[in-house]
């Protein structure tokens, strides 16, 4: 339903306001527990079980891929009237890491540069997902239209420096003790999303 509404909204000849997005933010919990329950007292739309850090990174990449596909893969302009000069975000998932990620498999941090390298190594055809296209290409190419994680890193650093920010992805981590939102962003022309994607307007961010 969400993907269909995004496509229809982006292709509507009479403007985006006629067609409403039917997208809902999903609450996702990632756990290393063997049982069904994630955090006690909390309700989630889906629970993902992992055994180690490689599985965890792969599942995060799959979530990003599903979000990217759901919102039109950066090819569909679904922004409302009046937002064309701004970044317009759609929140796909609210991701919670169960305490077992730290306690059972000892993961306290996930390096963002390592995550980019996993995107480079993992192919779309090698994951189990009903929505991600079956293609013999890496997630890095799917997201950024490049084959080198170093190229993505360099582009991010350059974009940050142009905005007066010193960036070093070696020191950027996802920490399981925090919650994260997974979003896509429609960006105005000239943004870092366009630089990385060879012309696309969006980006999958966690």
Model features per residue range: what roles?
Residues 1-206:
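Long, compositionally biased, intrinsically disordered regions
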């Amino acid at each position: 339903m969400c993907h269909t509404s995004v496509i229809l909204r982006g292709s509507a000849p009479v403007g985006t306001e006629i067609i409403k997005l039917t997208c809902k933010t999903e609450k996702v919990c990632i756990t290393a527990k063997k049982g069904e329950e994630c955090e006690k007292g909390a309700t989630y739309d889906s629970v993902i079980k992992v055994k180690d850090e490689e599985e965890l990174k792969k599942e995060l990449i799959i979530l990003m891929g599903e979000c990217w596909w759901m919102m039109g893969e950066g090819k569909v302009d679904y922004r409302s009237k009046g937002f064309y000069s701004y970044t317009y975000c759609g929140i796909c998932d609210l991701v919670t890491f169960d305490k077992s990620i730290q306690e059972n498999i000892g993961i306290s941090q996930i390096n963002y540069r390592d995550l980019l390298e996993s995107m480079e190594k993992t192919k779309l055809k090698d994951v189990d997902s009903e929505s991600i296209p079956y293609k013999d290409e890496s997630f890095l190419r799917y997201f950024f239209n490049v084959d080198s994680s170093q190229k993505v890193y360099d582009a991010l650093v350059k974009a940050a420096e142009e905005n007066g920010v010193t960036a070093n992805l070696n020191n950027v981590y996802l920490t399981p003790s925090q919650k994260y939102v997974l979003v896509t962003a429609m960006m105005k022309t000239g943004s870092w999303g366009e630089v990385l994607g060879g012309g696309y307007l969006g980006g999958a961010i966690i």
